[in-house]
Amino acid sequence: MNAATKLPGELGPIHFVGIGGIGMSGIAEVLMTLGYRVQGSDAKASKITDRLVSLGATFFEGQRAQNLGDAGVVVISSAIKKGNPELEEARRRGLPVVRRAEMLAELMRLRSNIAIAGTHGKTTTTTMVATLLDKGGFDPTVINGGVIHAYGSNARAGAGEWMVVEADESDGSFNRLPATIAIVTNIDPEHMEHWGSFDALRKGFYDFVTNIPFYGLAVCCTDHPEVQALVGRVTDRRIVTFGFNAQADVRAINLRYENGTAHFDVALQGEGEGHLIEGMTLPMPGDHNVSNALAAVAVARHLGMKKDEIREALAAFGGVNRRFTKVGEVGGVTIIDDYGHHPVEIAAVLRAARQAVKGRVIAVHQPHRYSRLHTLFDDFCTCFNEADVVAIAEVYAAGETPIAGASRDDLVAGLIAHGHRHARAILCEDDLERLVREQARPGDMVVCLGAGTISVWANNLPARLMGRAA
């Protein structure tokens, strides 16, 4: 590549509008470790912005035109709209305004890349790939959509050749990323406000896979019918498949769970008959998590990692924040915080909870966006079957206006109408505490699900239960 086409070493301060976002902060952190000057603003300070400041960033609380200072370039996410004072000031000055995905793509051009896409499982799979490459001595750079427990951050800058990134399909920008290895975990109808139709989303994933170079690799989960259909349409790129089905190149067999830990073997069918990695363990429950691990195994084998390295790395997997994260245990009741907000994710998490405990499962869900609840209403009414008790909180609007028939009470009524034996509404944290005190017994699990403020409730719950129990 001509050196002139690479990201220059000096750009002036790089200003991020919304630097505290999980997608923006990782890029900012990696840019700083590469020696760039970084500054940015957000509505309020957070653990994420505090970390960036500790690494050398300048942070502005609130968004004002004067925050730009002597910025040389401005980075925005798709959440930043026309009228934002910093965006308008950047345009008034004639500064380059760069979308988040475009800046990520520039960073990726400095490395060989593994990009992880899919409606669900991206963040966990990204973390698993990073974990295995760490163990294999690749020293990867990582930019993720969640905080990796082993790093205490959603990003790290490594000195190695490979970069591992979560590829976000929500606004179509994942097709701008120059992936060398492209992983697709699943494809479900989501983010229709951008794509408009499921066919357009399918085309987006097809483009994501076929954009890889001729020497690249697509790693695809053929347990999912949409991904299997995608594999059938891709005729001129190398593909490795993974899953539980008998045709997968990388296949999980002999799966069982003990105390929330998955034990299984991996048949490397693409390497020939009899190739196995025996005695694999993953310290978290859920068939969906085992499937995600298979994607990481496929990449690790492609890059030449030994079976023992793969086995040891996966056994030590530390997990991702808000992905089946245990936030406490009070009186024998385990409390879990999870980001799941799509019916497919919710059903998978509750199946994992059922595998992890002998007692009952109590699900607490805060729906995220009226539009999602409205579009997928029937799926929401049937995705809580593995929960003995379901409590539904008020919809987290995320800036949307209410939609008739898509409220908290509508969902509770829908759950009951579809046969759930114990569904109810809750209004506040006090209601959640009362529900747990009334329903939970030793050996039970409370699973708080959602992409909004439900995480705060989950993290506060252990102290509330202990404080008032004393």
Swiss-Prot record:
Keywords: ATP-binding, Cell cycle, Cell division, Cell shape, Cell wall biogenesis/degradation, Cytoplasm, Ligase, Nucleotide-binding, Peptidoglycan synthesis
Keyword Cell wall biogenesis/degradation belongs to the record: yes
Top EC group: ligase
Protein family according to the UniProt entry: Belongs to the MurCDEF family.
Main location, first listed in the record: cytoplasm
Xref: InterPro entries: Mur-like_cat_sf (IPR036565), Mur_ligase_C (IPR004101), Mur_ligase_C_dom_sf (IPR036615), Mur_ligase_cen (IPR013221), Mur_ligase_N (IPR000713), MurCDEF_pg_biosynth (IPR050061), UDP-N-AcMur_Ala_ligase_MurC (IPR005758)
NCBIfam families named among the record's database cross-references: murC (TIGR01082)
TM regions (residue ranges): none
GO cellular component: a single term: cytoplasm
Pathway: Cell wall biogenesis; peptidoglycan biosynthesis
Function: Cell wall formation.
Swiss-Prot/TrEMBL catalytic activity: UDP-N-acetyl-alpha-D-muramate + L-alanine + ATP = UDP-N-acetyl-alpha-D-muramoyl-L-alanine + ADP + phosphate + H(+)
Protein name: UDP-N-acetylmuramate--L-alanine ligase
The enzyme's E.C. designation: 6.3.2.8
GO biological process, one term: cell wall organization
